[in-house]
Amino acid sequence: MDRITQFRGEYAFLSNFYSAPVYYRGIRFENNEAAFQAAKCPGRMREFSKLSAPDAKRLGRRVSLRPDWETVKFDIMDQICKAKFLQNPDLAWKLVATGSAELIEGNTWGDRIWGVCNGAGENHLGLILMDIRDDLNLSQRDPDCPLYDEVGGRHEGGCGWRPGGVPCGECSSLSCGNCPKYLSTL
């Protein structure tokens, strides 16, 4: 099996530091890292919205963590990564183009939770991205898959919506703009 062992160069788009706008909880962030760091302290999320990834990470190290952070951080990362690829179809296609390669967030800064350093680590970011890639692949083939409507190019409303549509402020999924959850956040 092929392996992608660093999210740099050709594969920089896989990194949370990659500059790609993402809507999360009704707020537009410049990158996934800013959205993730903001989720640590929900009352201060807007402070992170315009920050670069390095600045967001620095600020995220100084905030008081929400009490349930250790139990919710993996689900939050999953939601934010899904939002990134559903809201940026060009990146979704690039993720699909990685084929069946194992995605490893290799690093030298010692992150053994989200990545792998010196051959050791849990690689949660890589695992999340591979799951999203599998869902994207399934959605292209299976009209019964819940993601088919969003990524496969068909929308039940018949409105002609395509990936890259209006992000729902409540759940970060995409809709044609008629989503009741989306409309309730305006």
Spans of features found by a protein language model:
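Charged, low-complexity intrinsically disordered segments
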Residues: 1-186
